[in-house]
Design a protein with these regions (language model features):
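Active-site proximal loop and beta-alpha junction motif in alpha/beta enzyme cores
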Residues: 1-78, 84-287
Length: 287
């Protein structure tokens, strides 16, 4: 059996930037064990599998597909950058003719629309709730040390804990944080947290005018630090909407690779997440 596979850098227009995802378009479903083995072999933060809903469907003309995401260690419920990358494979390599395609996922139907050089994802918004920092003092200490914090929020729906550093901390403080995966894992074992967001307010008056910055860590899912994380921005968009009063925001994730996301929080409680992609590898898996 041969399976086509693509490596796509998401949330960037430059190769070797953004967040790489492996994408496999499949004519039929595989065994769960095989999905996981392929994802482990690829060893990227996520490998996504696009599957035809019906055998008679066509990648060029079809408008609905199944989509699943796997880290090197487990299947996850939502992944933004691999969704963006999956849409890019359909639009650019499978020559899908539709302006919008819908992915059936564990997080419900996700629609993705091509818009010029960008792809826009329609994602659920995941509003976090304020938490007492004392409840998470160990993970806060492990993540940010003695740097002052302003807010601690938790998205129970995504199990993402968000720490906002005080406004006295600038981008250089955020990028200089040395977050150790082993220490994070040992500091949080309750199961309430499977991802950690650290964020600071941006500098919208300075070009290109980022409204906020962030980093994201998920060693609980086998990902020490994720380069650019669409799903984390379903939490961040809700939080910063409340703090900034802006529905349209420009965000930057400050990993070593870095990536830019355009956000629009809609009145219906969902968020549009837009970004670009670059395909850097196309090949075949032989099984």
């Amino acid at each position: 059996m041969e399976i086509s596979i693509f490596t796509v850098d998401a949330f960037t227009n430059l190769p070797f930037k953004g967040n790489p995802a492996a994408i496999c378009p499949l004519s039929h479903a595989l065994r769960d064990e095989l999905y996981q083995r392929i994802a482990t072999e690829m060893n990227l933060s996520e490998t996504a599998f696009i599957t035809k809903i019906n055998p008679s469907d066509n990648f060029t003309t079809g408008s609905r597909f199944c989509l699943r995401w796997f880290t090197p260690t487990k299947e996850v419920d939502l992944c933004g950058h691999a969704t963006l990358a999956s849409a890019a494979v359909l639009f650019q390599h499978m020559k899908n003719m539709n302006p919008t395609v819908v992915f059936e996922t564990r997080s419900g139907d996700l629609s993705v629309t091509r818009c010029g050089e960008q792809i826009v994802m329609d994602f659920p918004l995941n509003p976090p709730t304020r938490e007492d920092p004392k409840e998470f003092k160990d993970i806060i200490k492990a993540a940010v040390g003695d740097h002052p914090i302003q807010d601690v929020y938790l998205s129970s729906s995504t199990k993402k804990l968000m720490i906002r550093l005080a406004d006295s901390c600038d981008r250089s403080v955020l990028t200089s944080l040395k977050v150790d995966s082993t220490t994070l894992l040992s500091s949080e074992r309750s199961g309430r947290v499977t991802g950690l967001i650290i964020t600071i307010i941006g500098s919208p008056d300075c070009q290109p005018g980022y409204d906020f910055y962030s980093r994201y860590f998920a060693p609980w899912n086998g990902i020490p630090e994720d380069p650019v994380t669409g799903s984390a921005h379903t939490v961040l968009a809700s939080y910063w909407l409340e703090k900034l009063g802006k529905r349209k925001m420009l965000a930057y994730q400050c990993s070593s690779r870095g990536g830019e996301l355009e956000l629009e929080v809609r009145e219906d409680g969902r968020v549009n997440i837009a970004g670009r992609t670059v395909t850097i590898l196309q090949g075949t898996i032989t099984l």
